[in-house]
């Protein structure tokens, strides 16, 4: 509250889910199982790429976590899309929430109402994504 609080600490190396309640100024940090699936690549595919689910737009894997992916300055059309692994429909994520949400494997197409330039962030372990209009 005064900016003098200590750093967050964890009892052991591993994956954790951090939940923040901004209104109450509280947080919880809960250990979660390490993901077992890893992917060579993750992409977005859909009508937002200017075609009908034909062309993949590749995301870049994070240098510090193999489950975090991003793309900066993606020019997308209004439409819908899904995230998918290894350019295959075997593993894909989606939901019906536009700018942020948690995609489920085999879920609905993600809507995008406006043609724009976006930065996109995706976590293949949780399905969480964020889409940020940048221009």
Describe each model-derived feature in a short phrase.
Residues 78, 117, 129:
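Active-site lining segments that contact anionic ligands and/or coordinate catalytic metals
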Residues 1-4, 35-78, 86-108:
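Aromatic-rich carbohydrate-binding modules that target alpha-glucans
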Residues 1-24, 90-126:
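Structured interaction patches on ligand/partner-binding surfaces of diverse proteins
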Residues 27-29, 127-135:
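Short, low-complexity, Pro/Ser/Thr/Gly-rich segments in the mature regions of secreted, periplasmic
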Residues 33-36, 135:
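Bacterial Sec-dependent N-terminal signal peptides
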Residues 23, 32, 84-88:
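Beta-strand-rich extracellular modules
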